[in-house]
Amino acid sequence: MLGTACRSSWNTGNLDFPKTFFFQICRLDGGFLILILSYVASPQCRTIFQVSHSVSASSAPYRLSDALNRHIPGLKSTLLLRRRKKIDGLEIHRTPARRATDALRRHLAHGFDILLPERRKDLPFSLNVLGMGFDTAQMEKADVVHLHWIGGRTVDFSQLRHIRRPLVYTLHDMFACTAGCHCTMDCSLFQDECRGNCPQLGAPRLFRNIPAWLFSRKRRAFGRIPSLTLVTPSLWLKREVERSCMFPGRKIVQIYNPVDTDLFRPAEDRNAIRAGLGIPPGAFVIACGATGLFNPVKGGHFIPLVLEELYRRGHRNLHLLLFGNQEKSVDYPFPSTSAGFITDMNKLAGLYSAADIFLNPTLQDVLSNVALESMACKTPSVTFRTGGVPEAVLDGRTGLVAPQ
């Protein structure tokens, strides 16, 4: 079905990109937190801490923090990360590291793998037991504390009750409402407190109560937080959270992720960008991500299959444009250009513009920022009808959506 969608998108000029769509989806940047503050704090909020495992220039915490600092006079947004990273223009702090507890966490994770040898290693699962500590005094300086991606031992949820400030938790995957998995795929055990045989852990009978214990521990910790508002980037994720019993009685607000349309916009001369990449004139360019190509959630294994099917059906004038670093060598039936790992967002916007379509075969995604970025550059996305992706890709208008 994805190959059919690719063939159907040959004439991308038939796709319509309504201005109202981009206003609603992409122009939220600075206004994002204003909406949140109307639920959890007074309009006088001046200081906010964004807490996350790590960030990059393309991640939601970075974009939000940057937009708030640029667009809201007098408001200061600071990033608090487990892994410190230097990013120009933003104030970044690292959560305090303690050598003894760090070693204990590593041993705990190793013991977890020993107890569960059948656990799927290709899907992330976070215990968040003995997570990184917080400087509570530092947190008291903020008017609002905004949590983002806090898996991977970033925090111990039991510590959150000590933060006496309004907490906003934006869910970027399913982790918050499960025992520890980030992508539920076809599993619905999170609707029943993760009781049963977890398909990701593959636990022997003796340890099959581990997911239920982790779920219960997390729910108790969230229940002790004095002030907590949840934000989901898609209606799909909001409905999934509501199906879980992790957050009874908590306010859940749906707000789409921001995209800077001053940055991600159609290039003035896409032919010059193509020439610089060595792409022959007149080629039909299919762009896709190469990083994590064989991650089962990203669905990258469909890309060679789609290309082989297109070749079998007689399409020859195709050129593949790959973003990111490819972990494994793959033989494609068409010429390809690898742009490598991209850190310059202006360059990324140019690559989106150079493509005729963006192939995004994700099997579960909250919203798909890459789809929003490519569409902001007026490059349609071809994707599956899964998760919150259909909320971003309007089938037949800003892209094509294939049944999964």
Model-derived features with residue positions:
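Conserved donor-binding/catalytic core segment of Leloir-type glycosyltransferases
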Residues: 279-298, 304-307
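Carbohydrate-associated surface elements
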Residues: 236, 258
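Short alpha-helical donor nucleotide-sugar binding micro-motif in glycosyltransferases
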Residues: 350-355
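A short hydrophobic beta-strand element within the catalytic core of glycosyltransferases
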Residues: 358-359, 382
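Membrane-proximal helix-turn-helix segments that form the acceptor-binding/catalytic region
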Residues: 162, 175, 190-231, 239, ...
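Short hydrophobic beta-strand element within catalytic cores of glycosyltransferases
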Residues: 380-383, 393, 401
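Nucleotide-activated donor-binding/catalytic signature segment of Leloir-type glycosyltransferases, i.e.
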Residues: 317, 324-349
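Aromatic "clamp/platform" in nucleotide-sugar-dependent glycosyltransferases that forms part
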Residues: 363
